[in-house]
Every structure is written in structure tokens, then in C-alpha cells.
Regions:
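Low-complexity, highly charged intrinsically disordered N-terminal segments
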Residues: 57-69, 79
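Active-site flanking loop/helix segments enriched in acidic
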Residues: 32-34, 74-103, 144-148
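Divalent metal-dependent phosphate-bond-processing catalytic cores, especially two-metal-ion Mg2+/Mn2+ enzymes
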Residues: 1-57, 106-129, 140, 144-152, ...
Length: 296
């Protein structure tokens, strides 16, 4: 079998393990998943190609499904954009794009466990097409990221949205479809601005009414964006990468971000609300990491 085929099989095995293993709060399986599947041997475009061919993603059926080809072409475009950016940002690199697509897939692997029950459970039930739109958003969310920080709210996220629209226009995707996809994509990608997290999470802490589909999708992308950074080993490494990225512009902040105190503050400032993340015990892992850091 080709390298790609054996990689697809590896991904299939991981999704199966994530569905069956009882790994209550033990980060080992997720650490292994990211370490094993996010290697330099596999390009970002190949990773997306492989994901589109897994049993998991093939199971999200859409009639005349345009998304697998669209996601693969888009990943190639994003990959090319990163290749010509020299040097590539230490954290917001293709490795981060891979992490987010892998994390979103891990969340997607839990759909069969999401309750059909009450109104609040139903808000979490997305259509197959919604999941494909989320994968497209995961590829888009940091497109063209120069490794700087937002000077104004949503600055870099808006740039990613613009580049995504340019890609769709270049690829002669039908205009009415571009309009619909961009209407979904824009609020979801903008929600990944770290400063928006408090606003977004407030909607999920307030149990007065179920959340809109757009908010549920935004939350799942944000959780995918944060997932790898929450793991004890991978998270430490990613903190070091972020420090390298920030060093030229703000060395003080760079020192904080890779310190134990900085990591504790980061972990205390986030949380995981979706039942998909809870099924994977990411919230338990976050709380345990905080305890361990404070015990040091």
C-alpha cells in the first residue's frame, strides 16, 4: 500500500480507539494521536487528503458532496501560502493547521455518543454538511497568519476570511455557493480570536435557551483550535513554539507564555463545553494539568 493508504489506515485506527477506549482523563491516547499523525513526513495537504478518505469523514454523507475536493484543493493553497512565507511562524505554522484538523476530527469521531434527548442535546446535532463546513473552516482559520498578534479585534481572522474568499473565487466555485459558504464561515473563523473566547463561552454557560447552529459550530472550531495546547506534553511544546513566535515583538510576553505560571494562566482562561470534548475527557485533562502545574 502507498504511504498515504497506510496513513489513512492509521487514522482509521485512531478514530476507532477514540470511540472505544475508556481513557477517562488520561491524555496518553490523544498525545499519541497528535505526535504520531502530525509528522513532517506528511504534508498538510496530504493530511487533509487522508482525512477526507477516512471511514469517519466518508461517513458524513452529502449528496453530490463538493467538500472533499474543495477541502483538498484549499489545503494545497494554504500549504503553498505557508511555503512562500519565510520564515514560517513557529506556532502558526502548517503543524498548527494539522493539529486543528486532527483535533476537529477527534471531536467529530464522538458524534454517535451525542444524545438525541432533550432540547439542549439536540442543539449539538449537526448535519453531515455542517461537519464538512467545519473542516473547511479548520483549514481556513489561520490562513496567511504572519506570526503577529491582533492589533485590532479579529484583524488576522478577517485576513484569513478574505484569503479564503479569494481562493473560492479563483477556483470558479459557483457564486451562490460561495455566498452561502462564506456566510457560514465568517462568524465561525472570527470566533477563533482568543479575545472572543469569554463572549463565546458565556453563551454556553447561560442555559436559558439552546444555542444557534452557528454558535455551536464556532465553539467546536475553537475547541479544536485549543485542544492540542491543553495536553500536558504537546501543550508544553506548543507553548515554547508560541514563545519563539512572540520573541521578536514582545520578549517579556514570550517568557511568560512558556513559563509554568503562564501555562497555568492559559489553562485557567479556557474551558471545554461541547459534549464531544467531554466524551474525549479534554476538560478533565485541562483540570488535571492545572493541578499538576500548581503542585510543582
Amino acid at each position: 500500500p502507498s504511504e498515504l493508504e497506510s496513513f489513512i489506515r492509521t487514522l482509521d485506527r485512531f478514530f476507532e480507539q477514540l470511540q472505544t477506549a475508556s481513557h477517562a482523563g488520561d491524555p496518553t491516547l490523544l498525545e499519541h494521536y497528535f505526535a504520531h499523525c502530525n509528522t513532517d513526513a506528511i504534508s498538510f495537504a496530504d493530511l487533509v487528503r487522508a482525512l477526507c478518505h477516512t471511514r469517519l469523514w466518508r461517513g458524513f454523507e452529502v449528496s453530490d458532496n463538493p467538500y472533499p475536493k474543495l477541502c483538498q484543493d484549499f489545503a494545497q493553497s494554504v500549504e503553498h501560502g505557508s511555503q512562500i512565507m519565510q520564515p514560517e511562524p513557529a506556532y502558526h505554522s502548517r503543524a498548527h493547521f494539522k493539529d486543528v484538523c486532527l483535533a476537529l476530527s477527534a471531536l467529530a469521531s464522538q458524534v454517535s455518543f451525542i444524545g438525541e434527548g432533550e432540547e439542549f442535546d439536540q442543539q449539538w446535532q449537526l448535519s453531515s454538511e455542517d461537519w464538512w463546513i467545519l473542516l473547511f473552516c479548520a483549514i481556513a482559520h489561520d490562513y496567511g497568519h504572519p506570526g503577529t498578534r491582533n492589533q485590532t479585534p479579529f484583524e488576522l481572522e478577517k485576513y484569513a476570511v478574505e484569503l479564503t474568499q479569494e481562493f473560492l473565487l479563483r477556483h470558479a466555485y459557483p457564486l451562490f455557493k460561495i455566498k452561502a459558504l462564506m456566510a457560514d464561515l465568517e462568524p465561525i473563523v472570527l470566533a477563533t480570536d482568543p479575545r472572543y473566547f469569554e463572549t463565546l463561552s458565556a453563551q454556553f454557560l447561560n442555559h436559558m435557551h439552546p444555542n444557534k447552529r452557528e454558535d455551536v459550530m464556532a465553539l467546536l472550531l475553537v475547541e479544536a483550535d485549543l485542544c492540542a495546547s491543553t495536553l500536558p506534553q504537546r501543550g508544553m511544546y506548543l507553548g515554547e513554539q508560541l514563545a519563539k513566535e512572540w520573541e521578536p515583538s514582545d520578549s517579556k510576553l514570550a517568557q511568560i507564555v512558556e513559563s509554568d505560571a503562564g501555562r497555568t494562566r492559559f489553562l485557567e482562561g479556557i474551558a471545554f463545553y461541547s459534549p464531544h470534548a467531554r466524551q474525549l475527557h479534554i476538560e478533565t485533562i485541562r483540570l488535571k494539568s492545572i493541578q499538576e502545574l500548581k503542585a510543582n
